């Protein structure tokens, strides 16, 4: 069978309804969520005004992984994103581990975004307790589930509207903020600033830069994937990096970084300093829109990963079921609803960031290696995007991910170890037989190759 760039490995149960704008909505909806509105204050407290350079450095380090994702998505445009890339190239336990870490990272991130939206609503509820905020978050998650259940078109429509709202507020914050920036605030130096602290900040904000990954989880629903996916990935990373840098400059320039350190609403705080109390609520609306957009995009991607791992028998096979009418993976959406709700009922921002960073860094390092395997096995689809300077770019992608892992704090590494053990349990319960089939297949291929080589040798001797 001849595979074209636009239908390679496709799944006819999904409709290709998204163009470049729709794909961008998914990527930007995730990248411009909790990253700048929620964790930027904590990051500023870690390194001060050097936060601007930290966002630039993270964007530059991430570009290698983005290029590799673009190439993989063109040759393997299937639901599941990074997990599917690893599964179709490497296979076995490494593929499961990739999917596991990306799945858990997305689940926890959804909890963060839901809680962030709940906190914006909680401002208007006198003495709102954590339990009430948790219930609000679960209600928001249920609404997100219903939107995703209805259709992908509904999700991208919501993302498009929310992206417009958050973009107006964020761009206004940047445009107005430049007039309030004070050189003396930017010239401040954090007393603990050093290479390790700088890299620790980069790893901490890394969660803000993986939104492009979510584009590939909906590959089977994007029109002309060979053309639109690479463009959407690179544009998402470029636009988000520039916005992050500009917003960070305003955050640390308008007021001393110590005023927003450890704040989970830094933009609202700075908005109020610039324009008064009324602006606080304007920024709050932007925070709500931004985080709800991120929740929708990440919720969508998480369900797609669960669907893909069910399809490949690493998760229960019921998760691969797709509604014929709505073209959505209902069981996978329900699983995502349950797990995200459980986390949102008791989660916190720091835990989310640490868990997500560990999972993404480990998972993406394996995905970067998948490009090397893709090329060596000759699986690339002719006429599609291919990253330059092979194999330098994939190797740099692996290095830039793994070198950040040791800079995570000890709690992140401990939690990462617990997640790894949990993944082993899930693999033994569901993936072991699947892995045996994979190994048996490799053994059969090796035996066939050996028999072929022996046959050629005998023929040559005759």
Regions found by a protein language model. Give the residues of each.
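Membrane-interface loop-to-helix entry segments
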Residues: 132-181, 192-194, 233-237, 356-366, ...
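Hydrophobic alpha-helical segments of multi-pass membrane transport proteins
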Residues: 169-173, 306, 356-383, 420-439
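Helix-loop-helix junctions that connect adjacent transmembrane segments
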Residues: 3-15, 51-52, 56, 127-132, ...
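Hydrophobic transmembrane alpha-helices that form the core helical bundles
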Residues: 42-46, 54, 63-141, 145-149, ...
């Amino acid at each position: 069978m001849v595979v074209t760039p636009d239908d390679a490995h496709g799944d006819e149960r999904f409709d290709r309804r998204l163009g470049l704008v729709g794909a961008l909505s998914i990527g930007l909806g995730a990248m411009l969520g909790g990253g700048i509105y929620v964790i930027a204050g904590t990051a500023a407290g870690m390194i001060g005004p050097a936060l601007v350079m930290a966002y630039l450095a993270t964007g530059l380090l991430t570009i290698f992984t983005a290029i590799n994702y673009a190439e993989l998505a063109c040759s393997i445009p299937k639901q599941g994103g990074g997990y599917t890339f690893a599964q179709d190239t490497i296979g076995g336990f490494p593929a499961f581990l990739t999917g596991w870490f990306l799945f858990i990272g997305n689940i926890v991130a959804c909890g963060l975004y839901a809680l962030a939206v709940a906190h914006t609503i909680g401002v208007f509820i006198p003495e709102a307790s954590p339990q009430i905020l948790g219930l609000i978050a679960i209600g928001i998650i249920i609404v997100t589930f219903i939107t995703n259940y209805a259709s992908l078109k509904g999700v991208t429509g919501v993302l498009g509207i929310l992206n417009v709202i958050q973009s107006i507020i964020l761009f206004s914050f940047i445009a107005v903020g430049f007039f309030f920036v004070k050189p003396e605030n930017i010239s401040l130096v954090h007393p603990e600033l050093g290479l390790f602290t700088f890299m620790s900040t980069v790893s901490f904000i890394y969660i803000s830069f993986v939104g492009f990954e979510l584009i590939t989880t909906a590959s089977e629903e994007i029109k002309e994937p060979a053309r639109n996916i690479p463009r959407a990935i690179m544009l998402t990373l470029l636009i988000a990096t520039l916005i992050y840098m500009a917003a960070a400059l305003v955050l640390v320039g308008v007021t001393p970084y110590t005023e927003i350190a450890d704040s989970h609403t830094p933009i609202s705080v700075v908005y109020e300093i610039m324009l008064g109390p009324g602006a606080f609520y304007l920024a709050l609306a932007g925070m709500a829109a931004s985080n709800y957009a991120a929740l929708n995009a990440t919720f969508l991607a998480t369900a797609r990963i669960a669907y893909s791992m069910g399809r490949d028998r690493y998760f229960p096979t019921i998760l691969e079921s797709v509604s014929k009418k709505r073209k959505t993976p209902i069981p996978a959406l329900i699983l995502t609803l349950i797990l995200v709700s459980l986390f949102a009922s008791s989660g916190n921002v720091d835990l989310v960031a640490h868990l997500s960073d560990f999972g993404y860094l480990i998972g993406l390092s394996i995905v970067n290696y998948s490009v090397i395997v893709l090329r060596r096995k000759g699986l690339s689809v002719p006429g599609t995007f291919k990253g330059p300077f092979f194999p330098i770019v994939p190797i740099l992608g692996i290095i830039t991910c793994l070198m950040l892992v040791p800079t995570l704090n000890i709690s992140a590494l401990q939690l990462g170890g617990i997640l790894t053990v949990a993944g082993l349990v899930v693999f033994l319960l569901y993936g072991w037989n699947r892995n045996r089939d994979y190994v048996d297949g490799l053994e059969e291929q090796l035996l066939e190759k050996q028999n072929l080589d022996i046959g050629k040798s005998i023929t040559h001797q005759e």
